[in-house]
Amino acid sequence: MAHKKGVGSSRNGRDSQAKRLGVKRFGGQFVKAGNILVRQRGTKFHPGANVGVGSDYTLFALIDGIVKFERKDKQRLKVSVYPVIEPAQ
């Protein structure tokens, strides 16, 4: 038998809430202006054409269109939104 009662410390028992970061709209998806594309800490993804940056580095679409993930240079990725070109009738 244990001679000490198992006691938790008051220093335990804290855990931060998950922040739900990551890509919210993937390449090839249609988005509307204002849709959030990526939630991130810092600029893991950089803004490309027709993409704005929030104060917390959130990337969002400035126009309706199709999302495209592309290389900015060897290390950096950028996210762009291109308008949908409808065929002439």
Curated annotation (Swiss-Prot):
PROSITE patterns: RIBOSOMAL_L27. InterPro entries: Ribosomal_bL27, Ribosomal_bL27_CS. GO terms for molecular function: structural constituent of ribosome. Gene3D superfamilies: 2.40.50.100. Keywords: Ribonucleoprotein, Ribosomal protein. One of its GO terms (biological process) is translation. Belongs to the bacterial ribosomal protein bL27 family. This is Large ribosomal subunit protein bL27. It comes from Thermodesulfovibrio yellowstonii (strain ATCC 51303 / DSM 11347 / YP87). The gene is rpmA.
